[in-house]
Amino acid sequence: MNFPSKLLEDAVLEISKLPGIGKKTALRLVLHLLKKESKESESLANALLNARENIRYCKKCHTISDHELCAICTSNKRDKRVVCIVEDIRDVLAIENTNQYFGVYHVIGGVISPMERIGPDQLNINSLIERVITDTEIKEIILGLSPTMEGDTTAFFITKKLKSYPIKISTIARGIPFGGELEYMDEVTLGRSIATRTLFETKED
């Protein structure tokens, strides 16, 4: 793609680095921004910079937050006895949109993947174990991981680590097809899968 302006080319190049955005889409976005009032472009830039500099991760559940503890962890309306384990913030948002879950979360930050050299130590699994040990209020862990090979491996690993503790370990029902990801499931299917969750069983059980 040949550009009549180096400035335009640089802007398109930077935006095309974002996931799922090719150069044609990036060009369309840049041209759209150029047509807007400068204040609107400045507002976008400031919002991104502000988010980058000030957003933090919840000290307890590791989801994105404006404060040390997120709004979900500090809410008196949430059932602190139930903790849903998810991969990242997108899964939290997907589950919240179902309006079917009222517990809290623990974001582990991915799944175990030997191919990508991601092991348990690279994830927020140790903090999950520590949370279960220290928080006697927790009665149930829901494995809200995507039904992929890596997701199942991670679920199995977590289950083995928590097996000796007096808590119920369940998994969202398999209304979600194998290989699918939670964030792409429709709200009705995902909500039903959470409501009809079942006990997680390993092959050794």
Curated annotation (Swiss-Prot):
It comes from the Bacteria. Keywords: DNA damage, DNA recombination, DNA repair, Metal-binding, Zinc, Zinc-finger. SUPFAM superfamilies: Recombination protein RecR. GO terms for biological process: DNA recombination; DNA repair. Residues 81-177 form the Toprim domain. GO terms for molecular function: DNA binding; zinc ion binding. A zinc finger (C4-type) spans 58-73. The keyword Metal-binding applies. Gene3D superfamilies: 3.30.60.80, 3.40.1360.10, 6.10.250.240, RecR Domain 1 (1.10.8.420). Pfam families: RecR_C, RecR_HhH, RecR_ZnF, Toprim_4. The keyword Ubl conjugation does not apply. CDD domains: TOPRIM_recR. Belongs to the RecR family. May play a role in DNA repair. It seems to be involved in an RecBC-independent recombinational process of DNA repair. It may act with RecF and RecO. This is Recombination protein RecR. The gene is recR.
